[in-house]
Design a protein with these regions (language model features):
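Conserved SAM-binding loop
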Residues: 124
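Long, low-complexity, Lys/Arg-enriched
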Residues: 1-120, 130-182
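Conserved TIR/SEFIR loop-to-helix hotspot centered on a Trp-containing motif
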Residues: 127
Length: 182
């Protein structure tokens, strides 16, 4: 109702203040037994922090690195970072210098070298298509689990998934999806 009347900021505050804790709990409960724990989680950030928060809570990663673009500094500080600070405990922020494949791939690779681990995942939910494609290719090349947060129902009034309809979609699992070589 708030969004329909043009009160988008109030609708966003209502969502985070009233609904989001339940969304997190529901998401974590629904992914139990379906999502394996990982040592390191890489997340590509777009304009909404919710998917990153949901994925981190579900996977319980020991290390979490969130990547974002330089063009989002103002938006990041005002609209995204407060929610990351509120809902996540331990994470590292890394800014991509630009959105080129080479920069994204190399930045992800550098962070992987800094955080050696057995089990990695990369959440490709957020970011521009170039970022998502680069991150997915990197994840496949480096035997990461590649995943994203999807939804079964979208609420145009909220301008986000209907609370409780979020789903963790496991796109690629290196232990199951490696092609056979003859």
């Amino acid at each position: 109702e708030l969004s329909r009347s043009g009160r988008f900021l109030e609708a966003k505050d209502f969502y985070f203040d009233t609904l989001f804790d339940n969304v997190i709990d529901n998401f974590v409960e629904n992914t139990k037994g379906k999502a394996k724990k990982v040592d390191v989680l890489f997340s590509v950030l777009g304009f909404t922090p919710e998917p990153i928060i949901l994925t981190q809570r579900a996977l319980e990663a020991k290390e979490h690195v969130i990547f974002y673009t330089a063009t989002k500094d103002d938006c990041f500080e005002k609209d995204i970072n407060p929610y990351l600070q509120k809902y996540l405990k331990d994470y590292k922020l890394v800014r991509f210098g630009d959105e080129s494949f080479k920069t994204i791939y190399n930045t992800l690779s550098e962070q992987m070298k800094l955080l050696p681990a057995k089990e990695y995942a990369i959440d490709i939910t957020g970011g521009k298509k170039s970022m998502v494609a680069s991150a997915a290719i990197f994840g496949r090349d480096m035997n990461f689990n590649v995943l994203y947060v999807d939804y079964s129902d979208y609420n145009p009034d909220l301008r986000r998934p209907t609370p409780g309809s979020e789903i963790l979609n496991w796109v690629y699992d290196p232990y199951k999806d490696l092609p056979e070589f003859f």
